[in-house]
């Protein structure tokens, strides 16, 4: 597959306003666009999907109309548009309920930005993808795969460029990318640098020039550190966790939706380490499971429901299906269940984890996917063939033009990033390698250990203030 759709010219599309309302001092307008399913083969594939973008602007009763108005909501803000790209893959952007929800909205509105929250294709109010849709609309896994190949970062960016051309064709805009959204932002820089005024990234410097294997070797190392920190803070959880694992292995525990609670699925709960408060959150869940087992010899329905919905792999299946594919680009690149293949011995579940050695530490894993999930997660059981196709595919579209990225400088398209020293998902180690090899002339960083991966949410004002200081400073 070529890097760029042949003769790609962003269209100027009409759009529908599917909702518009005022919440105190903000106006929220939901804009719906019909875009090509496949940008690479539009001559033979005429299918369309819907993309919804949520436009948020400052509202003053004496100046603005209640409903969406193109002139006052788009034209008047055309020089200060900020597109927010959500993390994931496979998660929608938030639907704002106030200037403080999401927390990072207010700092942007204070700077007079119009903020466009994109529901990336396959998520939220855009044409969604879930197991039922894939099973009901396609005859086999090959057809499913041909469809979802169009839901990667490159297609997301073609959507962005199409929307920009439909709203502010003669202007540049800024982009704010959180986590996977940061990866998408750098893809945007690769394809359409002329469309970007500036790029802000939080916890999302992509591992340019690296393979999935490189990524997981790095993330296992920091996940090990998080496990040690967890057990140091809650030493009694060493025996509690081993007790829970032994009970899980001795039982057939069925979750409310029919999924299975196995020791492998239990191990996935370590994904929560990556956010501020994640260690404490996991401790609370471990304590509840342990108390359930000790007092009733079973895990309560409420606790099982919490475990079932803890990670989002079933409600957002692209998060499972594309977890490793986001690291694949170009001919010959494939993942082949990289996290599974690179799993260190001390993360592998053994008999000592099943209660036979109460002092051994059971290591939880991080943001990783494994073949066993297909059997343990109810919504994934019908996607086995599709998952295998994805993990063995070797002809992915290219997501980054490394030469173009290398040649970019801060004077052309400035990049500023909040880089978290203890980021479980996007490791500081890899970010520094990428900075040296590809972004040394274009990237300024706010490096901190005050926040984990969710710094944009928990420290919005400080994080964004620092990023704008980096953009505006002449002395860095």
Locate each region found by the language model:
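Gly/Pro-rich cap/lid or specificity-loop segments adjacent to the active site
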Residues: 21-49, 53-258, 372-374, 378-390, ...
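An N-terminal hydrophobic leader/cap segment in hydrolases
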Residues: 1-35
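Alpha/beta-hydrolase fold active-site neighborhood
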Residues: 253-393
């Amino acid at each position: 597959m070529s890097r760029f759709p042949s003769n790609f010219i962003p269209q100027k599309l009409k759009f529908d306003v599917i909702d518009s309302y005022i919440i105190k001092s903000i106006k929220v307008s939901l804009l719906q666009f019909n875009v090509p399913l496949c940008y690479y083969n539009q001559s033979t594939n005429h299918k369309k999907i819907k993309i919804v973008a949520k436009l948020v602007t400052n509202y003053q009763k004496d100046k603005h109309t209640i409903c969406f108005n193109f002139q006052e909501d788009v034209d008047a803000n055309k020089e200060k548009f900020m597109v927010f790209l959500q993390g994931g893959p496979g998660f929608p952007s938030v639907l704002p309920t106030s200037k403080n929800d999401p927390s990072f909205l207010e700092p942007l509105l204070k700077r007079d930005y119009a903020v466009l929250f994109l529901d990336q294709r396959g998520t939220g109010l855009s044409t969604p993808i879930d197991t039922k849709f894939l099973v009901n609309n396609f005859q086999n896994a090959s057809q499913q795969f041909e469809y979802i190949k169009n839901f990667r970062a490159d297609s997301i960016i073609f959507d962005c460029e199409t929307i920009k051309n439909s709203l502010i064709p003669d202007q540049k805009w800024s982009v704010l990318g959180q986590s996977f959204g940061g990866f998408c932002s750098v893809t945007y820089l690769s394809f359409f640098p002329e469309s970007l005024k500036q790029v802000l990234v939080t916890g999302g410097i992509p591992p340019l020039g690296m393979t999935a294997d490189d990524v997981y070797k790095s993330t296992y190392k920091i996940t090990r550190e998080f496990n040690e920190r967890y057990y140091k803070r809650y030493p009694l959880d060493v025996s509690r966790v081993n007790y829970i694992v032994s009970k899980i292995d001795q039982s057939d525990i069925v979750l409310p939706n029919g999924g299975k609670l196995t020791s492998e699925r239990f191990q996935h709960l370590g994904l929560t380490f990556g956010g501020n408060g994640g260690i404490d959150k996991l401790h609370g869940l471990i304590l509840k499971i342990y108390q359930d087992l000790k007092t009733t010899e079973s895990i309560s329905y409420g606790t099982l429901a919490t475990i079932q919905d803890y990670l989002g792999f079933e409600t957002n299946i692209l998060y499972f299906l594309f977890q490793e594919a986001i690291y694949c680009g170009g001919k010959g690149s494939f993942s082949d269940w990289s996290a599974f293949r690179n799993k260190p011995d001390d993360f592998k579940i053994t008999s000592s984890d099943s209660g036979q050695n109460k002092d051994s530490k059971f290591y939880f894993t991080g943001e990783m996917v494994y073949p066993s999930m297909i059997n343990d997660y109810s919504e994934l059981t019908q996607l086995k063939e599709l998952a295998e196709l994805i993990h063995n595919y070797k002809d992915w579209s290219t997501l980054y033009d490394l030469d173009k990225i290398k040649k970019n400088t801060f004077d052309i398209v400035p990049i500023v990033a909040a880089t978290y020293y203890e980021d479980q998902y996007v490791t500081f180690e890899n970010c520094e390698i990428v900075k040296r090899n590809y972004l040394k002339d274009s990237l300024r960083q706010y490096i901190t250990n005050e926040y984990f991966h969710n710094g944009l949410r928990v420290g919005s004002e400080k994080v964004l203030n620092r990023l704008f200081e980096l953009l505006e400073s002449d002395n860095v």
